[in-house]
Regions:
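Short cysteine-rich loop/turn motifs with clustered Cys
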Residues: 1-31, 55
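Histidine-centered nuclease catalytic patch
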Residues: 17-50, 62
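Generic macromolecular interface patches on structured domains
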Residues: 23, 64-68, 93, 97
């Protein structure tokens, strides 16, 4: 486990999908980008910097393990991307990137 993935412990979810997010730092993990451009493919996770602090529910929605009936796939992806950008600011402030 890298310093970035370990840093998720106790952080707030930054993805914040409405109607999905647990809103509890106890459930926050490091959610890796699921797009191939970030290095993901065939069982390989993307690089750690291509990620976001996300609760387990938001991560499941992003990974399409849990449907989000009130949102399109593009809207879920956009929420994740916004969370990614907020997470980069946090990582920078922590000196991790």
């Amino acid at each position: 486990m890298s310093r970035i993935t370990k840093s998720a412990n106790g952080e707030d979810c930054q993805v914040r999908i409405i109607g999905v997010c647990k809103g509890d730092p106890a459930y926050t993990i490091w959610s890796h980008c699921r797009h191939g451009a970030a290095g993901k493919g065939r069982g390989i996770k993307s690089i750690d910097v291509a990620g976001a602090y996300a609760c387990t529910a938001c991560d499941a929605a992003y990974d399409q393990l849990q449907g989000v009936p009130h949102m399109s796939r593009s809207e879920v992806d956009l929420d994740w991307f916004h969370g990614h950008m907020r997470s980069l600011v946090i990582l920078t402030n922590k000196g991790l990137i």
